[in-house]
Regions:
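Phosphate/nucleotide-binding beta-alpha loop and adjacent structural elements of enzyme active sites
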Residues: 1-295
Length: 295
């Protein structure tokens, strides 16, 4: 949670933020949880596993759409021994088996237990009525395909957090560079990387098997609507983006810029109040780039 939450500081209790969570954890909200705890968000989740619907609704998700996102055509679901690694892309043993603690072999976390045919749906087709402010995605290499068919949902969004790969652990996987190009064409810029993970390369066998040594594997990429072109933000988008960026992602510098633009347009005084609070805050904890801690 932010050091200086904007909603109570600026009296924005009536501001509602729409979140689209694609590939959610059934029992734990994403980083936006601090906002959700204060009733500031309405969450729509896309979660194809039927057993996830009840726990998602129980933790406050307003609506669950049980579909696989893609191009609207048939696909194959690869179910792995570690369920969290399952997805529509096939694990690539030529890459995975190079790394310490990762394996597609018998008993390995990426071992394919079975495959099954599924039908995908296009994001814009299944959620034409949702105008998200924040989109989060974690669907094992399928993030690019989901967003490529969701231009209508991207039109309202100001912040996107997507799981991304730096090296292809799945066959045909789109990587960070591909995602960056796609989102650039929709007016977004890469803002920061969080929970970056790596692994050592075999045959080295260090004492701490899960610690990274040299190779980037994956992480969470946060994109924002281009803040060098503030005319592309609506007035409400400026406020909502400022709240999300400050309260969820600790980007208080960018939040201040967006508030200043809102003040210029609407005659409010949010930026001055926030700037004064920043100047007197006992400690601030920016998140520029973070490594994922491993047990």
């Amino acid at each position: 949670m932010s050091d200086l939450p904007l909603v109570p500081l600026l009296g924005l209790s009536g501001l509602a933020i729409e979140v689209l969570e694609i590939g959610p954890q059934p029992d734990v909200p994403g980083r936006y949880g601090a906002l959700a705890a204060h009733g500031q968000v309405r969450v729509t989740a896309v979660a194809p596993a039927a057993e996830h619907t009840a726990p998602l609704l129980a933790r406050g998700v307003a609506r669950v759409v049980p579909v696989f996102l893609g191009d609207g055509g048939p696909a194959k679901l690869h179910v792995t021994r570690d369920p969290g690694l399952s997805g529509l892309l096939e694990p690539d043993p030529a890459v995975i088996d190079l790394f310490i603690t990762l394996s597609t072999g018998p008993g390995g976390n990426f071992q394919t237990v079975f495959t099954t045919d599924v039908q995908t749906a296009r994001l814009d087709d299944v959620l034409p009525d949702v105008a998200p402010d924040l989109i989060t995605l974690d669907i094992q290499g399928g993030e690019h395909a989901a967003l490529a068919h969701g231009a209508g949902r991207l039109a309202s969004a100001t912040v996107i957090e997507a799981a991304t790969g730096f090296i292809a652990l799945y066959k045909g996987q789109k990587l960070l560079g591909d995602l960056q190009v796609l989102l650039r064409d929709h007016g977004f810029v890469l803002h920061k990387l969080l929970d970056v993970e790596g692994r050592g390369i075999l045959p080295l066998s260090p004492p701490d098997q899960r610690d990274p040594i040299s190779q980037l594997l994956c992480g969470q990429a946060v994109f924002v609507r281009d803040f060098a072109a503030l005319d592309r933000y609506g007035d409400d988008q400026l406020l909502k983006a400022a709240v999300v960026l400050n309260d969820v992602y600790h980007s208080f510098d960018l939040a201040l810029l967006l508030l200043a633009e809102h003040d210029k347009r609407r005659g409010t005084a949010y930026a001055a109040a926030f700037h004064a609070a920043l100047q007197t805050a006992p400690a601030l904890h920016p998140q520029f780039l973070t490594l994922k801690s491993t047990p």
